């Protein structure tokens, strides 16, 4: 199963501005889709049921690709959308973090109708990843934006309630992305202080019930692990995190770093997915 990575460009990183593919040994397979509607790609989520890949494009649109890399669904350009990460919700809709509006919005899977704000605009200073837990709660990373605005926490939203509760208070956290682990806990890619040359980069696991820090995943000496971004659990159960020049793997069961599975200079990865 190929590993796909969105490589940033522009203010998000001096990458390739493309959706790149790698084989199971980490060897590059080239660009997965050359469609001109893909520019500075961000969020990336595989829908294994429909065998589609949803991609948030820096061209202010959301796309869905088939297994051959052809765009088969397109919202069309949406002025000011500026999408970040994406995830499917318990209602089946495709949810997207909005950087300008500082909220989360929901599109129908068909991408043929306008989205609806799931949370109020400006709910956080700068959204940095989100995911739905087992009980339908939404966990939203509130991080630091490109100009330094923001805070460093994880907020929780109960179903049918857009009033947040501050779940995580961790002085070592500056979230970049988050995912729900097989055990129901929250795992978060962190770079603290955000943007600093000597930032401490980790993946941190928090209890979904009370937000306490469970454990910290570290690269040790196996990789530089600069500018960590997207997180994804693979079909093998391992936890993967894309970064500036590599994709790292961690054994989630014992917390050990397995090293790099992809090494690619200037990758500046934003998100990753195993597809098809």
Where are these regions (language model features)?
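Residue position within the beta-strands of beta-propeller blades
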Residues: 4-7, 54-55, 96-97, 139-141, ...
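Short glycine/acidic-enriched loop and turn motifs that connect beta-strands
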Residues: 9-14, 59-61, 101-103, 144-148, ...
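Beta-rich, blade/repeat-based domains predominating
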Residues: 14-16, 35-50, 78-94, 121-137, ...
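A short beta-strand motif characteristic of beta-propeller blades
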Residues: 27-36, 70-77, 113-121, 163-169, ...
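Short loop/turn segments that connect beta-strands within beta-propeller blades
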Residues: 23-27, 65-70, 107-113, 157-162, ...
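A short loop-to-beta-strand structural motif that recurs across blades of beta-propeller domains
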Residues: 17-20, 61-64, 102-106, 152-156, ...
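Blade-level signature of beta-propeller repeat domains, shared across WD40, Kelch, NHL, RCC1
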Residues: 244-276
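An edge-strand/N-cap motif at the start of beta-rich repeat modules
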Residues: 1-30
